Structures are given as C-alpha cells and as structure tokens.
Amino acid sequence: MVSTTLSVSRMTFVWRAARPSLLNHSLRKMSYQEGKPEPAKQALKKSKLPLGRFDSLEDSPEEREPLQKFPDDVNPVTKEKGGPKGPEPTRYGDWERKGRCIDF
C-alpha cells in the first residue's frame, strides 16, 4: 500500500515537472510556424448527385417574385379582386409553395 502511494506520487511529480516543458515546446512550435506561409486550403468536394427540383437557388428572381401582379389587383380571367395570383392551386404539384402547404 505504501509503495503504491509512493509510485503514484512520483508519477504525479513527474507529470507536473514535465507539463511546463510541454507547454513551452508547444508555444515555441506555434511561434515558429507563424513565420511560414500556410498551405492553400483545398475546396470541399461537391456532391456527385444530380440537381433535383428542390435544389434550385433560393436567390433566383423567380423565388423573389414568381408571378407578375395583375393590373389594379384584378385577375383578368376570373375578374376576381385580390384573389390568388397564380395558376389553379388544385393542379398536381401546386400544393406546396416555398415549403408551405396550401390547405383549403
């Protein structure tokens, strides 16, 4: 029991004695590397998957203002004032717009 305690205290002493030299070594290494130019970073690889329907850019002009506004806010086909601005929403594929689902 006494020898185990003695060996543990010696290891602790050795570690504490070695710690400042490790710190100094790492600081010297960092200061030495500051003078060297950093290697050029490689660009991240792009995925090899094809672009899908939902992978389009969100900053495109179609996303900002997808449909033209009606003159005087009146639909020329239905003569409805303030109604929906786009095509018939019950067509297949038109139930979702910008991540929002239409619920009637």
Swiss-Prot record:
InterPro entries recorded for this chain?
A: SDHF4
Q: Which regions span the lipid bilayer?
A: none
Pfam families given in the database record: DUF1674
* Compositional bias of kind Basic and acidic residues: 63-83, 91-104
> Carries keyword Repeat?
no
According to the UniProt record, where is the region Disordered?
Answer: 29-104
The record's family statement is: Belongs to the SDHAF4 family.
Q: How does it assemble?
A: Interacts with Sdha in its FAD-bound form.
Q: What does this protein do?
A: Plays an essential role in the assembly of succinate dehydrogenase (SDH), an enzyme complex (also referred to as respiratory complex II) that is a component of both the tricarboxylic acid (TCA) cycle and the mitochondrial electron transport chain, and which couples the oxidation of succinate to fumarate with the reduction of ubiquinone (coenzyme Q) to ubiquinol. Binds to the flavoprotein subunit Sdha in its FAD-bound form, blocking the generation of excess reactive oxygen species (ROS) and facilitating its assembly with the iron-sulfur protein subunit Sdhb into the SDH catalytic dimer.
Q: What is this protein called?
A: Succinate dehydrogenase assembly factor 4, mitochondrial
Name the source organism: Mus musculus
Name the gene for this chain: Sdhaf4
